[in-house]
Amino acid sequence: MAEAKIVVIYPRPTDVDAFEKAYVEEHVPLAMEKIKGMSKFAATKVVGTPDGSTPPFYRIAELYFPSMEALQQCAASASTQEAVAHAFAISTGGPPIVLVSEEETTKF
């Protein structure tokens, strides 16, 4: 069974320092408290592009679940919706992109 995940892609914020403070001090702790059933959480900061231009996105969050069923149950909960609303509230560069996916991994 493939792992399922929610991927949240945040656009570059209007104020990077204010976003970073809200993300680290408010949002991540809130998400960890409210979003139940995750098997793994990965936060990524986008630091550049291959051509050196400013990237249009600033952060990517990946919330892993053991199955699509577990993800769907979690996503339907009021506590998860509270965390999602907070993600949108702190995203000053525009609404974040939220995707549901199944991970396919190849190991070398």
Give residue spans per PLM region.
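Macromolecular interaction modules
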Residues: 1-108
